[in-house]
C-alpha cells in the first residue's frame, strides 16, 4: 500500500517522506490549513521589525554577578529543569532520520515510524522568562562515510582510567554515534529503536546528572548497546570515554546554543578530534531572529544574541556564518549548512509563529590536514539579518 502524505508534501520516487522545505504557502488565505509551512520568506518590514525587537531586548544586560551565577551553577539549573519535567518536556525526535540518514546507516527507508512523527515539527523551547527572576542586587544595568578502524591501539587517559583503542565501551562496534546533550533520551532511544544492527553502538552524555539518571532508569536503556555518562562540554580537563578518531557520527541537537559563546570553539574542536576521518558532525539549533529570541524581555540578555530563560538555562541564536566558522576552524568540511524558516500555526487559537532553525552537517576530511585555529566571532557582533532572513 502506498504511503499517504499530507496535502502539500510531495511523495518522492522511492516513497520516502522528503526532507524539510517541501510544503510552501502560496496562498496566504490557506495559512491555517496546515500546522506548518516551509521556507517562508520574510518581508523587508518583518525582518526590520525583528532586528528592532532584538535591539530592544538586548539591553540592559543581566548584571555581572548574575551572569557568573548562571555560568558557575549551570549544571544545577539543568538538574532543576529535569527534576521538574523529568521525561515529559521534549518529544522523541523521529524526524531526525529523515534529515540525518547517518543516524540509521543500515536503513534505506524508515519502517514503523508514523509520518506525523517523521515530520520535523520541532519545538525545543524552555519555559518563558520573567523579569523578577533576573533582578540583580548590584547596580549594574542589567554523508555517511565509514572508515575501517585503526589497527594500531591508541592509548589515552580517561579521567582516572587509562583506555586503549581496543578497550573502551563499544570498542567492538563498527559504527559509533555520540550524542552530546542527550537529555533524557529523546534522540538516543529513537536511534536504538530504529537500528537493530548489533555492530552499532551509541554514546550519550549530558551536563545534568539528573537527566542521565532518568535516561538510565528508562526501560529502553540497554548498556550492551548504549553508554550514558555525565559530561561538561566546556570542561577542558574532562575526557570522553572513547579515543580520538573512533566515532562515525556526533550529534548536537539544540545543545551548542546552551553554552557560553566564548567556549564553543574549544568544545567543537575537541569533539572533532573524536571523529574518524570521514565521520560527520550533525547539528540543529536556533537561528538568529527565531520567535524564541524575539519573545525575550528586557533584562534577560547576557550578551549579543545570548539570553537566559526564566529557569536559569541559557540560549544563543546563531547565524550560518558563525556555525561555519566554528566547524571549519575545527578542521571540518561543510556538507550542509541550511536555514529552516518555518511558519508554525496554532489553528485552534488562529496564531502564527515564525521559527528559524539552522541545520548543519560537517565532515572530517579523509586526508587529514593541519588547520589553523580561528576564533569564533564575538557574541556581540552586529545582529544584521543579511544572509539569514
Curated annotation (Swiss-Prot):
Taken from the record, one Pfam family name reads Methyltransf_12
Annotated TM spans: none
Cellular component GO terms held in the UniProt record? cytoplasm
Where found?
A: Cytoplasm
So what does this one do? Answer: S-adenosyl-L-methionine-dependent methyltransferase that mediates N(3)-methylcytidine modification of residue 32 of the tRNA anticodon loop of tRNA(Thr)(UGU) and tRNA(Arg)(CCU). N(3)-methylcytidine methylation by METTL2 requires the N6-threonylcarbamoylation of tRNA (t6A37) by the EKC/KEOPS complex as prerequisite.
Chief location of this protein? cytoplasm
Please name the source species: Mus musculus (Mouse)
Top-level EC class: transferase
Matches recorded under SUPFAM superfamilies: S-adenosyl-L-methionine-dependent methyltransferases
Write the record's keywords in alphabetical order, separated by commas. Cytoplasm, Methyltransferase, S-adenosyl-L-methionine, Transferase, tRNA processing
Could you tell me one molecular function GO term of this UniProt entry?
A: tRNA (cytidine) methyltransferase activity
Annotated residues that bind S-adenosyl-L-methionine are located at: 78, 82, 181, 206, 232-233, 253
Query: Looking at the keywords, is Iron present?
Result: no
Report the sequence similarity comment from the record: Belongs to the methyltransferase superfamily. METL family.
Assembly and binders: Monomer. Interacts with DALRD3.
Tell me the GO BP annotations in alphabetical order: tRNA methylation
Q: What name goes with this protein?
A: tRNA N(3)-cytidine methyltransferase METTL2
Amino acid at each position: 500500500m502506498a504511503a499517504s502524505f499530507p496535502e502539500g508534501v510531495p511523495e518522492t520516487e522511492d516513497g520516502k517522506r522528503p526532507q524539510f522545505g517541501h510544503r510552501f504557502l502560496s496562498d496566504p488565505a490557506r495559512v491555517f490549513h496546515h500546522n506548518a509551512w516551509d521556507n517562508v520568506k520574510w518581508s523587508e518590514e518583518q525582518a526590520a521589525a525583528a532586528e528592532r525587537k532584538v535591539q530592544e531586548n538586548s539591553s540592559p544586560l543581566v548584571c555581572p554577578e548574575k551572569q557568573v551565577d548562571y555560568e558557575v551553577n549551570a549544571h544545577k539549573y539543568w538538574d532543576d529543569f529535569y527534576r521538574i519535567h523529568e521525561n515529559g518536556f521534549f518529544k522523541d525526535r523521529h524526524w531526525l532520520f529523515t534529515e540525518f540518514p547517518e543516524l540509521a546507516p543500515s536503513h534505506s527507508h524508515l519502517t514503523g515510524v508514523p509520518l506525523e512523527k517523521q515530520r520535523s515539527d520541532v519545538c525545543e523551547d524552555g519555559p518563558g522568562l520573567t523579569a523578577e527572576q533576573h533582578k540583580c542586587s548590584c547596580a549594574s544595568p542589567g554523508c555517511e562515510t565509514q572508515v575501517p578502524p585503526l589497527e594500531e591501539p591508541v592509548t589515552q587517559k580517561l579521567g582516572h582510567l587509562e583506555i586503549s583503542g581496543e578497550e573502551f565501551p563499544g570498542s567492538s562496534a563498527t559504527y559509533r554515534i555520540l550524542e552530546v546533550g542527550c537529555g533524557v533520551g529523546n534522540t538516543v532511544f529513537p536511534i536504538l529503536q530504529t537500528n537493530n544492527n548489533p555492530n552499532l553502538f551509541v554514546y550519550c552524555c549530558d551536563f545534568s546528572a539528573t537527566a542521565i539518571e532518568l535516561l538510565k532508569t528508562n526501560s529502553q536503556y540497554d548498556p550492551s548497546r548504549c553508554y550514558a555518562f555525565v559530561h561538561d562540554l566546556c570542561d577542558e580537563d574532562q575526557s570522553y570515554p572513547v579515543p580520538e578518531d573512533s566515532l562515525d557520527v556526533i550529534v548536537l541537537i539544540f545543545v551548542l546554543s546552551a553554552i557560553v559563546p566564548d567556549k564553543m570553539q574549544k568544545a567543537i574542536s575537541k569533539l572533532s578530534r573524536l571523529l574518524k576521518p570521514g565521520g560527520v558532525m550533525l547539528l540543529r539549533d536556533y537561528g538568529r531572529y527565531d520567535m524564541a529570541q524575539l519573545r525575550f524581555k528586557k533584562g534577560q540578555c547576557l550578551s549579543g544574541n545570548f539570553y537566559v530563560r526564566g529557569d536559569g538555562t541559557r540560549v544563543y541564536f546563531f547565524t550560518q556564518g558563525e556555525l561555519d566558522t566554528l566547524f571549519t576552524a575545527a578542521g571540518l568540511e561543510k556538507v550542509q549548512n541550511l536555514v529552516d524558516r518555518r511558519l508554525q500555526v496554532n489553528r485552534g487559537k488562529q496564531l502564527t509563529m515564525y521559527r528559524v532553525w539552522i541545520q548543519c552537517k560537517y565532515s572530517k576530511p579523509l586526508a587529514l590536514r593541519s588547520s589553523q585555529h580561528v576564533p569564533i566571532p564575538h557574541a556581540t557582533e552586529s545582529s544584521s539579518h543579511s544572509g539569514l532572513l
